[in-house]
Amino acid sequence: MRVIKGILISLACIVLISISSLYLTGNGFMINAIKRTYLAGNKTANINDHKAFDVATIKAGNKTPLPKHKNYNTTPLSADFLAELNKYNTAALLIIKDGQVLSEHYLNGYNERSKTNSFSMAKTITAMLLGIAIEEGHISGLNQPITDFLPEFKDDLLAQKATIGHLAKMNSGYEWDENYYSPLSPTVELLYGDDVADFLLQGHFSVEPGEFWEYSSASTQLMGIFISRALQKSGAAKSLSDYLSRKIWQPLEMNDDALWHVDGQSMELVFCCLNTNARNFAKLGLLMMNQGQWNGQQIVPADFVKKMISPTGSIDGTASSKGPQYYGLSTWLAHDRNPVFFWLSGHLGQYVINIPEHNMVIVRLGEFNNKSLDYRKPTTIPDYISKTYIKQALELIK
């Protein structure tokens, strides 16, 4: 008994020393990561982890469901496609045609009310809020210097040249390592840290703004901090969640409240982690498909939506050597595919796919994705989307 007691005391000491070491080395965020993810048996964040985070509520108002297409679920999905959905633990598959639900399927215990994590699809939603804030005059435009609302960078010579447009297009030059699986990566600290603003505002810019495109969750989070401060200064909103609720969620008559992860300071994690259901994600896709308009009301300025789905380049959204053809303002593009499409994309294969030529939106939510897909290899994801989801959707309307 004495031996067992000694072992337990030793283990407790090791745990305490380990925890103390994490805090002393500035890695206290790892405690949250261990509790919320690793002890749950996951190697990375998962689509149901809102249950382990503090959240802000995006309030819905009047609730109007999407109408069902006259051919709703009349044509079965192909056996190969169903196998693909099951292979990666798909939660929801929704196909919209002409604003109506054509095909709707829930798998692996999920249903039409299940709230799951958007991951980086939230980046595109945050960009919509930027467009609205510019239209309302809270932000002067995409050329506004970031130091106007991020004065912590006023002594950084490169940051002095950066604009809010650079953050939205991800060519700001902010130093960053986008890595979801390394426990000590800055991206993991951004997700699990207690104060994301303090963490990011201690960073620096290492490349001339506008000269180099690099996918970066930090850029979107800095954009969110910028928008939040602008809204608070003008008195337009007390938080980004409040602004999203009043400017998008309620006008679109979403069917349920949404949940947005927040840090210890109640700052929304705008680079990720907006939790809602498949039908609400579909409405966001339809909003973009309709140039920012919903039921005759202009929600997001049409010219801003056009910039969102135009290749990264000059500030007006035209293509240039300074940015890729496959990314716009916080939106992924496939202008070289037939049919052309653009999409919201999130970790583990969260997609809202928009196909303007066919007036279709496809939503796929799920627990895993094909491991061969990598945003750093820009052809892999659009190739997969074309050959898998779009192929199946087009078969339904033959």
Task: Label each region the model flagged.
Residues 219-228, 270-293, 350-366:
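Active-site-proximal alpha-helical segments within enzyme catalytic domains
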Residues 254-258, 309-361:
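Active-site Gly/Thr loop motif
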Residues 136-175, 202-204, 232-272:
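Active-site helix/loop module of the DD-peptidase/beta-lactamase fold
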Residues 243-310:
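Active-site-proximal binding-pocket segments
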Residues 107-111, 115, 368-370:
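A short acidic/small-residue loop/turn micro-motif
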Residues 1-111, 139, 194, 384-398:
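N-terminal leader/targeting segments and the immediately adjacent pre-domain N-terminus
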Residues 99, 117-142, 167, 223-227, ...:
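Active-site SXXK
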Residues 156, 208-216, 268-275, 344:
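Solvent-exposed loop and edge beta-strand segments that line ligand/cofactor-binding
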